[in-house]
């Protein structure tokens, strides 16, 4: 549901490190405070973000079929993606599998768990993790480039 509610303005390609900003909007909230974050765009995610901006001319929304000023229909978007995945991937692969895969791939390169949580927007159990501004994009990007 996070991506479905994105505005084109939430995709930042003109900074030193291309990234997207996940933040609450009136049409889509986020689950936790940790869900609000900047996520570096690298490799295929950067390609997809550029393609999304190029192919989606009018209006402010990245996915206008599923989002408007009043609501974000993440369930319909998820159902459509899961249908496509059933037809094009191995059995059992669903859209949520990508979050599990991200965590597994970051673990495989020995990424520290607090950085994994920062990238994925997962909350941590440590009170100390909520202090400060979090990791800079350079650090997050360094780990994402390893996967």
Model-predicted regions and their roles:
Residues 62-63, 103, 131:
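Bulky hydrophobic/aromatic "packing anchor" residues in well-ordered structure
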Residues 25-26, 42-91:
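Active-site/catalytic core of tyrosine-dependent DNA strand-transfer enzymes
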Residues 33, 95-96:
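Residue-level marker of regulatory loop/turn positions in helix-turn-helix DNA-binding domains and
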Residues 1, 5-50:
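Conserved tyrosine-mediated DNA breakage-rejoining catalytic core shared by Y-recombinases
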Residues 35, 55-57, 142, 147:
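Extended, non-catalytic subsegments within catalytic or DNA/protein-binding/adaptor domains
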Residues 1-2, 76, 80, 97-123:
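C-terminal catalytic core of tyrosine-transesterase DNA break-rejoin enzymes
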Residues 26, 46, 68-69, 113, ...:
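Catalytic-site neighborhood detector that most strongly recognizes the C-terminal catalytic loop/helix
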Residues 34-36, 60, 128:
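Short, solvent-exposed beta-strand edge segments and adjacent coil->beta transition regions
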């Amino acid at each position: 549901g996070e991506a479905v509610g994105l505005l084109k303005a939430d995709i930042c390609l003109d900074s030193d490190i291309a990234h997207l900003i996940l933040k609450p909007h009136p049409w889509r909230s986020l689950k936790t405070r940790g869900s609000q974050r900047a996520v570096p765009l690298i490799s295929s995610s950067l390609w997809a973000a550029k393609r999304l901006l190029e192919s989606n001319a009018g209006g402010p929304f990245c996915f206008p079929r599923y989002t408007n000023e009043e609501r974000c229909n993440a369930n319909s978007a998820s159902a459509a993606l899961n249908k496509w995945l059933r037809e094009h991937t191995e059995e059992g692969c669903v859209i949520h599998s990508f979050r599990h895969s991200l965590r597994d791939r970051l673990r495989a390169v020995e990424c520290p768990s607090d950085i994994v949580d920062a990238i994925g927007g997962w909350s941590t159990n440590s009170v100390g993790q909520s202090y400060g501004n979090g990791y800079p994009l350079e650090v997050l990007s360094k780990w994402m480039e390893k996967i």
